[in-house]
Amino acid sequence: MEFHQIDERNQALLSKIAVDDGHGENSPYFDGWKAYDNDPFHPEDNPLGVIQMGLAENQLSFDMIVDWIRKHPEASICTPKGLERFKSIANFQDYHGLPEFRNGIASFMGKVRGGRVQFDPSRIVMGGGATGASETVIFCLADPGDAFLVPSPYYAAFDRDLKWRTRAQIIRVHCNSSNNFQVTKAALEIAYKKAQEANIKVKGVIITNPSNPLGTTYDRDTLKTLVTFVNQHDIHLICDEIYSATVFKAPTFISIAQIVEEMEHCKKELIHILYSLSKDMGLPGFRVGIIYSYNDVVVRRARQMSSFGLVSSQTQHLLAAMLSDEDFVDKFLAENSKRLAERHARFTKELDKMGITCLNSNAGVFVWMDLRRLLKDQTFKAEMELWRVIINEVKLNVSPGSSFHVTEPGWFRVCFANMDDNTVDVALNRIHSFVENIDKKEDNTVAMPSKTRRRENKLRLSFSFSGRRYDEGNVLNSPHTMSPHSPLVIAKN
């Protein structure tokens, strides 16, 4: 059964949300995942499979989490030592969450920010992961048709998380490589004016700090510019800070919470923070999303809405114990930062040897890789052609910049912290062979007549890297079926 097909009968029977493409998943960002699901790399069982470099997971310090759990079996209600709390934890819990969990989260958020700011546990609101928390905030702040200004490039799934069910809009604040994609006041004003001219009501600005996909942090002046901008226009500022503990080198991460305390005339009720343990602790499966708002009404309403996506009490109980262990938290944060720095340095150093540069970054679990020189021309069409070869032939799931709405073709987000060292070696070897092959083809075309050279340039990305061409038939029979509008499917037509 091909679940992506919606016939006329279902078009009439179902809601607009159920039948439209507002989910935003018809993009190379999600199709790369599906390509991996259909042909996952395994060093022994499937050594020629697709390596997952499109998933922003932090698995580098997972051993520390496992070791802590092994030493503290009482933290789980599903072990003999934790059973005495089973009934009290398994019973219905208040929407506020376990007090010890909210205290632990507030303490952890403060530690991640170097103790430079404190968080009030009474303002902690839970959500079903950062996705659920993000959507809840949008429901609290905007009506269908209202818009948020979002600097681009931005997290590819925002099109789903922020827009699909809320029916809000995203208006891009265009940033470019001339200043390393930094947000400027001029760019904000241009986007705001564009919305006004289209008679669209702007309800706020949304940023990710540290940035996904750039891996950079906002400096103090830019954050103050953003606060001043929202104050002047009396709109909200939502700061997604889920990568705040992934900073691995200078400059130090600055939270919007610090700016709120520093600025004398800041309208605090306009500031909201999104947080999660998915990236900072590498626990995406626990679905811990956090809303921290300085607006009392938002805190109250978000808490009521959280009934649609609560964090399980068992998860809260375990994490409350873990986060209250200050010695463990201190060691984890320091070691995690060290491991991220080492992996990032190793990965970018090897890319540099191949002539591939990345945006200078200091945070996150990915690099913003510059492959503009490999495009046959500077267009997004050429970017998609290159991406298809990387997916289908090089067998690496990397995410093209177009899926993050970047303004310049040729940038790719590549995740480096979701695999072991051996898999990193395989991935780097594949990239090296790929680039070397292209460079050789370029060298061989230099002496060709111009007409022949043009033909070779068009074909230079069509070589068979692995000796196995992508079998679209297998994709269409997979339980992870791609939409007929998928860039990977369209590529074959």
UniProtKB/Swiss-Prot annotation:
Enzyme Commission identifier(s): 4.4.1.14
The protein's name: 1-aminocyclopropane-1-carboxylate synthase CMW33
Originating organism: Cucurbita maxima (Pumpkin)
Record lineage: Eukaryota, Viridiplantae, Streptophyta, Embryophyta, Tracheophyta
Residue list for modification N6-(pyridoxal phosphate)lysine: 279
Enzyme class, UniProt record, top EC level: lyase
Pathway: Alkene biosynthesis; ethylene biosynthesis via S-adenosyl-L-methionine; ethylene from S-adenosyl-L-methionine: step 1/2
Similarity comment text for this entry: Belongs to the class-I pyridoxal-phosphate-dependent aminotransferase family.
Listed cofactors: pyridoxal 5'-phosphate
